[in-house]
Amino acid sequence: QIERFRSEVTRHKLEVVVSHDSYLINLASPDPILRARSIASFCQELQRSGALGLRAVVSHPGNYLDDRDSGVERNARAYAECLRAVPGELEVWIEGTAGSGTALGSRFEELRALRNALPDDVRTRVAFFLDPAPLPAVGYDLAHGETVWEQFDSVIGLGLLKCLHLNDSRAPAGSRGDRHEWIGEGCIGPEPFRRIMRDPDLAGVVKIIETPKRDDPLRHDRRMLRRLRAYARGNTQVTAGV
């Protein structure tokens, strides 16, 4: 199965393939038993993804439950332990969150602190993955998209932004919610996505849709891809049916 998967990736000329770790994993947990289980599970995720020849494993930071700074430290130690246990070129791309409850990773400064807490020998294998959907929910202004990416560049550096999940949002600004909607049809609207698709600074960033599937997943995915390609061409008259 592994060889068949690798063969299909080559046949379809897929340049970047990533996986997403289990949502049950909590590498920031103060509970030693839960944290140990999470570390074991994340190591298995890395091993499987490495065997499949993937570029990276996408990982949400954990929930700290007690103290935020301690959670960042625990999360970083766990990433380091797992990356050392599974050497190679496979990377971890930390995905920003909506920051609900005690979830880490809603602010760029917190993402930077998490990566900076990693030892030198594994830090180069860790980068970032953002989803526009929760950005307004935690206070970032996508209506003026240049500002968001300038902020990221100033705090972390755009060179460390490896991938974007392209989703509109059903969660209003400031809600700390993360509920996806079809691109251009949610609280974010079409204009920020047009800018993303035409921004030369984001041209080398991988873009993956994660929009709702509803009644017909393949049809809706194709519709979203057509819409994004139209945005990239500068089309400003894309209708809801496209």
What positions do the PLM features span?
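N-terminal pre-domain/capping segments
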Residues: 1-21, 25-44, 234-242
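Alpha/beta catalytic cores of nucleotide-metabolism and tRNA/nucleoside-modifying enzymes
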Residues: 202-206, 233-238
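Structural preference for beta-strand elements that scaffold enzyme active sites
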Residues: 15-18, 55-58, 89-95, 125-129, ...
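C-terminal helical cap(s) of enzyme catalytic domains, especially alpha/beta-barrels
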Residues: 217-235
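Gly/Pro-rich active-site loop or hairpin
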Residues: 69, 104-112, 136-204, 212, ...
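Active-site beta-loop-alpha junctions enriched in small/polar residues
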Residues: 21-24, 62-64, 95-101, 131-137, ...
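Acidic (Asp/Glu)-rich catalytic clusters
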Residues: 1-18, 43-53, 80-89, 115-125, ...
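Active-site acidic/histidine proton-transfer and metal-coordination neighborhood
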Residues: 27-127
